[in-house]
A protein has these predicted regions:
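Structural signature of tandem-repeat unit edges
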Residues: 22-35, 49-65, 75-91, 101-117, ...
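Register-specific detector for alpha-helical tandem repeat solenoids, activating on a conserved position
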Residues: 41, 68-69, 94-95, 120-121, ...
Length: 186
């Protein structure tokens, strides 16, 4: 069993501010089942031409606490099924899918968000999303929801009736420029 310290960005992510502009497919083979990262922060940030994640079910997220910016600015990614992700220990989902403009399908049905405190900008600028099922989200510990759906221009309906916002201190511009929403259940 291998782990990381949670402070290093993986080698494949590089260190360019301009992002990764050549990788269209990422493959997680069987060997990833033995790797136990504690952070996936910025793992695929600015992979602007990434279109497919193969074998992502081999990525073991059991020990991950930080998923901040994991798919940030993955402009070309049309869908991602994260139904196998174990998010029980995650506290930070800030900008996790931010600026994934082509994202039309996102399966978060098994996300355990009971320990998450930061959802700031989680889906902002996801213009391709027309619907998003967050009915299983436990938001009791969340403090920051600022810009969570900012500029999600394709969203037509959103049901957040199960959201517990008791501890939220910032909801600024949460729905700003969500011009397509015709049904918002709070």
């Amino acid at each position: 069993q291998k782990t990381d310290s949670g402070t290093e960005i993986p080698a494949w992510a590089g260190n360019s501010q301009d992002g990764e502009k050549t990788t269209t497919t990422v493959v997680f083979d069987e060997s990833f089942k033995d790797f136990r990262p504690v952070s996936t922060d910025y793992w695929f940030a600015q992979y602007t031409v990434l279109k497919e994640l193969k074998g992502i079910e081999n990525l073991n997220t059991t020990d991950v606490t930080n998923m901040s910016h994991m798919f940030y600015h993955c402009d070309a990614l049309p869908s991602v099924d994260l139904s196998h992700f174990n998010t029980e220990k995650v506290t930070d989902m800030n900008s996790m899918f931010s600026e994934c403009a082509s994202l039309t399908s996102l399966n978060l049905s098994t996300f355990d968000t009971k320990n998450v405190t930061d959802m700031n900008s989680m889906f902002n600028f996801c213009a391709g999303l027309t619907s998003l099922n967050l009915s299983n989200f436990n938001t009791a510990k969340v403090k920051d929801m600022r810009a969570m759906f900012f500029c999600c221009t394709g969203l037509t309906s959103l049901d957040l009736s199960k959201f517990n916002t008791e501890n939220v201190t910032d909801m600024g511009v949460m729905f700003f420029y969500c011009k397509g929403i015709t049904s918002l259940n709070l």
